[in-house]
Amino acid sequence: SKSSIETPPSYNQLNYNENLQRFFNSKPVTAPVETDPIKMEQSYSTPANTGSNLSPMQCFEDSGGSGSSRNCTSGSNLNMGSVTNTSNTGTGTSSGSAPLVTLTESLLK
């Protein structure tokens, strides 16, 4: 016996499969997939004083076994360049790490 507090399914929830079928039957026009790799624009300034602003890779390489730790504490300014995705078809993934997959009816089943 179900609780009377539960919300009954809505019309859209009951007809989810029918809505999907109707969507794919309508042959929707989708944006063409770009064959160019995602254009990446690096936007960061190179610090003049590299003694206190080290890249995360430099901190990682210097931290192992040598006994001398450069200014790599969590409070130091790490030079982490921010990468901006300038492509309007990007999915937020980095360039080439995940292939773009076109949504098809078979993927939803």
UniProtKB/Swiss-Prot annotation:
Role according to the record: Essential for biological clock functions. Determines the period length of circadian and ultradian rhythms; an increase in PER dosage leads to shortened circadian rhythms and a decrease leads to lengthened circadian rhythms. Essential for the circadian rhythmicity of locomotor activity, eclosion behavior, and for the rhythmic component of the male courtship song that originates in the thoracic nervous system. The biological cycle depends on the rhythmic formation and nuclear localization of the TIM-PER complex. Light induces the degradation of TIM, which promotes elimination of PER.
Subunit (UniProt): Forms a heterodimer with timeless (TIM); the complex then translocates into the nucleus.
UniProt KW keywords: Biological rhythms, Cytoplasm, Nucleus, Phosphoprotein, Repeat
Post-translational modification note: Phosphorylated with a circadian rhythmicity, probably by the double-time protein (dbt). Phosphorylation could be implicated in the stability of per monomer and in the formation of heterodimer per-tim.
Repeat recorded as keyword: yes
Protein name (database record): Period circadian protein
GO CC terms: nucleus; perinuclear region of cytoplasm
Biased composition (Low complexity): 81-97
